[in-house]
UniProtKB/Swiss-Prot annotation:
GO terms for biological process: translation. GO terms for cellular component: cytosolic large ribosomal subunit. Residues 1-25 are annotated as: Disordered. Keywords: Ribonucleoprotein, Ribosomal protein. Residues 7-19 have a biased composition (Polar residues). Coiled coil: none annotated. PROSITE patterns: RIBOSOMAL_L27 (PS00831). It comes from Rhodococcus erythropolis (strain PR4 / NBRC 100887). This is Large ribosomal subunit protein bL27. The keyword Metal-binding does not apply. The gene is rpmA. The lineage of its organism: Bacteria, Bacillati, Actinomycetota, Actinomycetes, Mycobacteriales.
Length: 89
């Protein structure tokens, strides 16, 4: 009777699917309301003007406009510059 498990082939062989996290819309891109901006675990980016935060910390646009990344009180924030203002600038 063998006392080795044959290179432990039966105990290996599992891997989880990637979570597809990260920034989905970058600075300067135009978005419509409801579009996902950042998928994240925890608040690496905080919601700014016209940006909402979901239960899984996903940031999404509350209004149409252009994406803008910035900082406020030492935190990275994501803002949406409204489309009307973005068209004039």
């Amino acid at each position: 009777m063998a006392h080795k498990k044959g290179a432990s082939s039966s105990r290996n062989g599992r891997d989880s699917n990637a979570q597809r996290l990260g920034v989905k819309r970058f600075g300067g891109q135009s978005v419509s309301a409801g579009e996902i901006l950042v998928r994240q675990r925890g608040t690496h980016f905080h919601p700014g003007v016209n940006v909402g935060r979901g239960g899984d910390d996903t940031l999404f646009a509350l209004a149409a406009g252009a994406v803008e990344f910035g900082q406020k009180r030492g935190r990275k924030t994501v803002n949406i510059v409204p489309a009307v203002v973005a068209a004039e600038v």
